[in-house]
């Protein structure tokens, strides 16, 4: 009997060692806050029913946005807005369509606890990460502390700050490295000219002026999303949204 107990003990130790080695091997490439944030960006346990992640709506192949008018959250529930891109978000003055977040860190946690999106209290999200062997190990390795709301937001922020578009064809054209096709040049002229007037709002190197605009769709009836007004409570902000 004693021999069986000893063998069982050593078998358990061996199994734990193998599992630990597996996790270490799997995560040798995750050494930075940004790398951890990238992994968390696709992590579904951060939603109430573990069905959606940040990447469910911020889809990489669609410029970290999606292709529908209203994005879907937990349980397939439609949200009230579509998903903005998270590209080129570094050093923006505010975030979300209505500017309700002042920093990337503040922005990062809001979708998790939004009942229409991921529907999970931040306290529960942190609890799940602490109960998850792999994530607990990664947070301790990178932040030198267990998962908490602050370092969770920091990881997301670090990842999102890496999502900069610096090598597009337009960038190359701006730096005299490539020529635009005739069709692309016509599009550029339309974009910056007085006919379409896109450039009035979509200017600067990231094609945004970081301002709020009302393009005339809000009517307070069937189109009743008041946008910035919901945050500022100023009548002049009715129907205004951040320039993407």
Question: What is each PLM-predicted segment?
Answer:
Residues 39-40:
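Hydrophobic face of amphipathic alpha-helices that form TPR/SEL1-like repeat modules
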């Amino acid at each position: 009997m004693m021999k069986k107990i000893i063998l069982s003990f050593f078998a358990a130790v061996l199994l734990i060692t193998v599992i630990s080695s597996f996790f270490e091997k799997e995560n040798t490439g995750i050494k930075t806050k940004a790398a951890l944030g990238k992994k968390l960006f696709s992590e579904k346990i951060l939603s109430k029913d573990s069905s959606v992640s940040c990447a469910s709506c911020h889809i990489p192949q669609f410029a970290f946005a999606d292709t529908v008018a209203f994005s879907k959250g937990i349980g397939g529930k439609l949200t009230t807005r579509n998903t903005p891109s998270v590209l080129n978000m570094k050093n923006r003055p505010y975030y979300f369509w209505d500017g309700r977040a002042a920093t990337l860190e503040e922005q990062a946690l809001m979708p998790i606890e939004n009942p229409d999106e991921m529907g999970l209290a931040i306290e529960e999200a942190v609890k799940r990460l602490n109960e998850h062997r792999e994530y607990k190990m990664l947070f301790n390795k990178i932040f030198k502390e267990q998962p908490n709301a602050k370092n969770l937001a920091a990881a997301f922020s670090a990842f999102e700050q890496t999502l900069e578009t610096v090598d597009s064809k337009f960038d190359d054209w701006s730096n005299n490295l490539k020529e635009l096709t005739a069709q692309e040049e016509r599009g550029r002229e339309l974009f910056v000219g007085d006919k379409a007037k896109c450039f009035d709002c979509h200017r600067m190197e990231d094609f945004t002026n970081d301002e709020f605009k009302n393009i005339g769709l809000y009517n307070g009836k069937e189109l009743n999303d008041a946008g910035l007004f919901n945050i500022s409570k100023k009548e002049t902000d009715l129907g205004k949204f951040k320039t993407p």
